[in-house]
Amino acid sequence: TVRWWWPGNAVNKMQIEKELRAFKKAKFSSVELQTLTIGLPEKHLEKNEEQIFRVGEKEYFENIQHVFSVAKDLDINIDLTMGSGWSSGGPFIKDFPEKQLIKSEVEIMGPANIKIKPPDISEPAYVNKTNFIVNNTIGDFDKNTKLEAIIFAKILPSKKGSILTQLKDVTYLFDGNQITLEVPVGKHKLFFIYQNNVSHNTLGSAYSGSLSKSLVIDHLDNRGTEEFIKRLGELWIEEIYPNKPTNFFIDSFELIGELPWSERLFDAFNEMHGYSIKPYLPLLFKKNGESKYLYAIFGEEFSFRSQNNVRERVYEDYLLTRQHLFMNEFLLPMKNWINSYDIKLRLQAHGGYGNYLDSYSIADIPESESLFAGGSYDFLKLASSAGNISNKKVISSESFIKIDFNYDRLEMKDYERLAGNAFSAGINHIVFHGYAYEYKY
């Protein structure tokens, strides 16, 4: 398979046919079409918005129909990326975008009897750092915050960072304007914890309207999945009929959040683990949020420590809850919908909130990649192992990716080495990454 990048809908039928014939001549049996704006200058995107940002419009589907027509004559299978860019979302997502918990805090010395109003809440630190790496990944800070909990904790000094103990949910003491507290002797903190939208934009989306905003869905709530299917999936099925792709492809997720959240998480956590997560929420925050773009640089250091491994135990339960929701609220409903049209799901599970082995396993074609985790043998084995235990005959990998400003530096020996590494790790289908539609700007 070759991944075929289009500059949105800035394409023409003559060039489409020319490039499909080139794929056939190069012995590719299938083509995956992915519309992207990555690599195009921002000024060019703004100037040519009407030509590029037309994915999902009538003229885009006319070009897709032409792809199917030519591919049928050439005996080439066509896969379609589910949407434009990654992760799943678009400018049409209004009701159920990706959510997070954020916090503000007040330090208090006791003993004291005090009245405190919630301090101002500001944009988390991970946002600017993430946007420095990938421009405009996170959009404007969502000021429409919802107070979810107020937690009171005692602080114990430590050379390795503050320890939180005696955590209590004191939300019930809040009168809507302020909270009145009897503070015992010692150093304490009061945490105001809010839910809001991450404002995470789908990276590289060429969907109509994406130039300004293209929100990623809440992958932990099936209402987000349903919004995506209703506003994108069903439209695509209708517009490309009677054609259909061999596979719908869902790219890696790279989900982001200060503390990734969903409205369903409180209840799901209680049901799964038999206790409330609320008092322990301050322990779950990390200094740089949860951003895959930052982990390699800053690591995953937590903001606070605990005694008796409380933080580690609660965080593990939180992860299990998140994995459960990701599987049952997004992956399975999406797969079932795709399969209902006799189309297969090709899935890169990494970067999401699921257990990777379980997530890869539900795909019809589990797919790894040679960029995530540096394309290490062990990482590639995650997809192939999951495919083997779930009896999947095809296990693919997005291959021949090189982090380099000169992409022509790959020589034949590099292709042989990278392909050999994939095959030795159990990959049996190479996705060539990739071929860019010939576009002059």
Q: Language-model features: where?
A:
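Loop/turn elements at helix/coil->beta-strand transitions in domains of secreted/extracellular proteins
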Residues: T1, A26-V31, K72-D79, P242-T246, ...
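N-terminal-proximal low-complexity accessory segments that begin disordered
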Residues: T1-R54, L357, P366
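Glycine- and acidic
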Residues: T1-W6, E49-F53, S205-H219, R311-Q323, ...
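Short, acidic/polar
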Residues: N9-F23, I229-I237, A349-Y356, F379, ...
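Mature extracytoplasmic enzyme cores
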Residues: V11, Q15-E17, A22-A26, S30, ...
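Catalytic domains of carbohydrate-active enzymes, especially glycoside hydrolases
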Residues: Q15-I38, N63-V70, N243, W337, ...
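Aromatic/His-enriched, Gly/Pro-containing loop or helix-boundary segments
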Residues: S29, L33-L74, T81, M109-I121, ...
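Hydrophobic targeting/anchoring helices
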Residues: G90, F249, Y341-Y441
